């Protein structure tokens, strides 16, 4: 619930910007990347562990974060913010599944019951997705796929961070965001970059 509260203003500003998906990806990525990298560089523990980013697990987490951020941004541009946030809330389900294979953890029954209830909630949200006020006129199905894609890649990145906990997460997310910003910059039409 804390994560949803933190993400809510981000989603609100993204929607208010009325930018296309590539402009949002560019600005959000570059700004978030610079802020997180600068902020994390103020802490000795992040500076000491910086070299751990350059490992197979580190690059895997960067890829997961890039994919998650792309799906999240595209989903926000495509459909209702509530649907994206609701589907994003399924990331612990994916984290539980990935942790079985990567960490060898066993998941208890209460986790699977919670997962089923969350999926029912997503189903209800998707079924009523066309009736949301002020939502973009995009596809609810594509938005749902984007939300689930963002949740799955976020869940995998969290499990990989647990697999190698000495990787500085904040710095890594900043690098991923910066990569997303540069990807958006390569694709966005220059005329659209300053509109919104």
Residue locations for each model-derived region?
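Specific transmembrane alpha-helical segments of multi-pass solute transporters/efflux pumps
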Residues: 7, 43-83, 88, 124, ...
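Transmembrane alpha-helices of multi-pass small-molecule transport proteins
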Residues: 19-67, 94, 152-157, 174-192
């Amino acid at each position: 619930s804390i994560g949803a509260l933190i993400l809510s203003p981000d989603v609100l500003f993204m929607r208010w910007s009325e930018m296309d998906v590539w402009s949002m990806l560019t600005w959000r990525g570059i700004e978030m990347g610079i802020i997180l990298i600068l902020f994390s560089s103020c802490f000795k523990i992040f500076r000491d562990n910086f070299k751990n980013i350059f490992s197979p697990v580190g690059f895997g987490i960067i890829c997961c974060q890039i994919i998650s951020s792309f799906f999240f941004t595209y989903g926000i541009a495509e459909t209702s913010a509530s649907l994206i946030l609701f589907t994003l809330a399924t990331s612990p389900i994916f984290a539980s599944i990935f942790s079985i294979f990567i960490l060898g953890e066993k998941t208890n029954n209460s986790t699977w019951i919670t997962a089923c209830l969350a999926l029912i909630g997503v189903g209800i949200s998707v079924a009523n997705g066309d009736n949301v006020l002020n939502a973009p006129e995009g596809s609810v199905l594509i938005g749902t796929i984007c939300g689930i894609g963002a949740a799955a890649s976020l869940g995998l990145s969290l499990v990989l961070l647990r697999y190698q906990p000495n990787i500085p997460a904040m710095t890594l997310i900043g690098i991923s965001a910066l990569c997303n910003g540069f990807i958006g910059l390569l694709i966005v039409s220059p005329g659209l970059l300053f509109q919104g």
